[in-house]
Amino acid sequence: MSAQTNSGIQQLLEAEKVARNIVEKARQHRTQRLKDARLEAKREIDEYASKKEEEFKKSESQASGIYSQAEAESKKQVQDTFASIETSSQKNSDKVVDAILSITCNVK
């Protein structure tokens, strides 16, 4: 029985060794899957961040164009108003001077 017992023990040791190898391969496979998942998640995050950055720059550019257009329109309105005031003052300056002279010279 000693040989049979040794043979049984050897089979158990071999089975344990095979089981350890299977468990180790499973751990390595799991570790590799986790690494791959992390890399994939990082790639997706970077891709999403890049897309959102591009969208932000596009909307910022559009807003800048709108603000520039509004600023140009405001400047034109101010210039038109000043030109109108200038024209009006040139037209009526003689009348204003005459009115002032009339009031100051005609003392009652």
Curated annotation (Swiss-Prot):
GO terms for cellular component: cytosol; nucleus; vacuolar proton-transporting V-type ATPase, V1 domain. InterPro entries: V-ATPase_G (IPR005124). It holds the Pfam family V-ATPase_G. It is a peripheral membrane protein. PANTHER family: V-TYPE PROTON ATPASE SUBUNIT G (PTHR12713:SF11), VACUOLAR ATP SYNTHASE SUBUNIT G (PTHR12713). Subunit of the V1 complex of vacuolar(H+)-ATPase (V-ATPase), a multisubunit enzyme composed of a peripheral complex (V1) that hydrolyzes ATP and a membrane integral complex (V0) that translocates protons. V-ATPase is responsible for acidifying and maintaining the pH of intracellular compartments. One of its GO terms (molecular function) is proton-transporting ATPase activity, rotational mechanism. GO terms for biological process: proton transmembrane transport. Residues 48-60 have a biased composition (Basic and acidic residues). Residues 48-89 are annotated as: Disordered. This is V-type proton ATPase subunit G. Keywords: Hydrogen ion transport, Ion transport, Membrane, Transport, Vacuole. Residues 79-89 have a biased composition (Polar residues). The keyword Membrane applies. V-ATPase is a heteromultimeric enzyme composed of a peripheral catalytic V1 complex (components A to H) attached to an integral membrane V0 proton pore complex (components: a, c, c', c'', d, e, f and VOA1). It is found in: Vacuole membrane. Belongs to the V-ATPase G subunit family.
